[in-house]
Swiss-Prot record:
Residues 48-463 are lumenal. GO terms for cellular component: endosome; Golgi membrane; trans-Golgi network. This is Probable glycosyltransferase 3. It holds the Pfam family Glyco_transf_34. It comes from Oryza sativa subsp. indica (Rice). The chain crosses the membrane at residues 25-47. PANTHER family: GLYCOSYLTRANSFERASE 3-RELATED, XYLOGLUCAN 6-XYLOSYLTRANSFERASE 5-RELATED-RELATED. GO terms for molecular function: hexosyltransferase activity. Residues 87-99 have a biased composition (Acidic residues). It is found in: Golgi apparatus membrane. Residues 1-20, 82-125 are annotated as: Disordered. InterPro entries: Glyco_trans_34, Nucleotide-diphossugar_trans.
Length: 463
């Protein structure tokens, strides 16, 4: 990923150089001590001890010499143990240090850099953090924007600048079909962003080895917020979610007083404490201090291993209907909003007026009916804004639904959305199950007039 963040890589390099110098110094000490031991051995074998204890060398002198040698050897062994201990600590630091710069705290004093990650994680009282605490971000961001007018927080249309963020695993999928449909999902997101003037980042890097799986989005979102102060909203979207209403635009004015916009059902959230009351497959975070603090509060349940397993037990006991498994980011967010309602909910907008997240199983077989009765731009059950293939896992073989049904549904969703894009060029898919296209209009005889008609994205599409 092309996005980088500030001076942290330089700090990491400086820390690495410091560790290298320390290891070099330790090696020199070991070499000198080994040389000293060699000198002692030679003294005992070729008679160098005569220079120290005299030629006569009575029994008393031999006893003193033996005691002195024993003391020296003991000191040498003690020093060697300390050196080995120091070296082991350095190696642990390197092994424990996460991939992302956000997951460690680096302090620089008089050109000496110390990475404290491993020591903190070895502490039984350690609470996981995404990185150094950021304060006064709103003021710092305003100041940066005023000093960098070339990076405005609004786009050419005067709307708040949005960064759409998605991602996929670094390794290939289990089979080529998974990679193919992830590519289609990425192409779908690029199309929507191009039409609506939204920037997009697709990450294939794990920025923090502790936060893998569901949790990988948290360090990525934090890093992008801090690296792109010109962005007003950061919009996360899962790789298995597709835009299916290419004309619908986010009603951003509705969220003027909100910092988190997430699809969900308030009744399920507050009355039933359901673990599916919200969906973190598609949500928006405002680039502000509040959001950074929410990410900090959200992350501690995420580190893989014992922490995540124990947190999963807490979430299963706290939320209705949740199966027993390790902590996931969606359940953790719901738990935080319920247990710390006064702290967070005033700035959370639970969106249920349109499908910021639409469950695929009840949608993909109705696309023809939607085209017959409705038109793009509605965003709700009549023409869903987003179709999310929850439980399909196209990149792996352990989904909750038959693989053929999932891939067939993704094909239909992609072509349903792609027809809305191809209309501009006078083409459409032969059917929602086919990748082949056919010409439906000649857009080249009077291109500018035809373009004006085609740009009416919310016009009815002929079935």
């Amino acid at each position: 990923m092309a996005v980088t963040g500030g001076g942290r890589p330089a700090a990491r390099q400086q820390a690495a150089r410091g560790k290298q110098m320390q290891r070099t110094f330790n090696n020199v000490k070991i070499t000198l001590i080994c040389g000293f031991i060699t000198l002692l051995v030679l003294r005992g074998t070729v008679g160098i001890n005569l220079l120290t204890y005299g030629v006569g060398g009575g029994g008393g002198s031999d006893a003193v010499a033996a005691a002195e040698e024993a003391r020296v050897v003991e000191d040498i062994e003690r020093i060697l143990r300390e050196i080995r201990s120091d070296t082991d600590d350095d190696d642990d630091d390197e092994e424990e240090e996460p991939l992302g710069v956000d997951a460690s705290t680096t302090t620089t004093t008089n050109s000496t850099t110390t990475t404290a990650t491993a020591a903190r994680r070895r502490s039984s009282n350690h609470t996981y953090t995404l990185g150094p605490k950021v304060t006064r971000w709103n003021a710092k961001r305003r100041q940066w924007l005023s000093r960098n007018p070339g990076f405005p927080s609004r786009d050419a249309r005067g709307k708040p600048r949005i960064l759409l963020v998605t991602g996929s695993q670094p390794a290939p999928c289990d089979d080529a079909a998974g990679d193919h449909y992830l590519l289609k999902a990425t192409k779908n997101k690029i199309d929507y962003c191009r039409i609506h003037g939204i920037e997009i980042v697709h990450s294939m890097a794990h920025l923090d080895r502790e936060l893998a799986g569901y949790w990988a989005k948290l360090p990525l979102l934090r890093r992008l917020m801090l690296s792109h102060p010109e962005v007003e909203w950061v919009w996360w979207m899962d790789s298995d979610a597709l835009f299916t209403d290419m004309a619908f635009e986010l009603p951003l004015a509705r969220y003027d007083t909100s910092n988190l916009v997430i699809h969900g059902y308030p009744e399920l959230l507050f009355a039933k404490r359901s673990w599916i009351a919200l969906n973190t497959g598609s949500f928006l975070l405002r680039n502000c201090q509040w959001s950074l603090e929410l990410l900090d509060a959200w992350a501690p349940m995420g580190p893989k291993g014992r922490v995540r397993d124990e947190a999963g037990k807490v979430l299963t006991a706290s939320l209705t209907g949740r199966p027993a498994f390790e902590a996931d980011d969606q359940s953790a967010l719901i738990h935080i909003l319920l247990t710390q309602k006064e702290r967070w909910m005033d700035k959370v907008y639970v969106e249920d007026k349109y499908f910021l997240h639409g469950f695929w199983a009840g949608l993909v077989d109705k696309y023809e009916e939607m085209m017959e009765r409705h038109h793009p731009g509605l965003g709700d059950e009549r023409w869903p804004f987003v179709t999310h293939f929850v439980g399909c896992k196209p990149c792996g073989g352990y989904g909750d639904y038959p693989r053929e049904r999932c891939l067939g549904g993704m094909e239909r969703a992609f072509n349903f959305a792609d027809n809305q894009v191809l209309r501009l060029y006078g083409f459409r898919h032969r059917s929602l199950a086919s990748a082949r296209v056919r010409r439906v209009a000649n857009r080249t005889d009077n291109p500018l007039v035809n373009k004006e008609a085609a740009l009416k994205m919310d016009a009815k599409i002929e079935s």
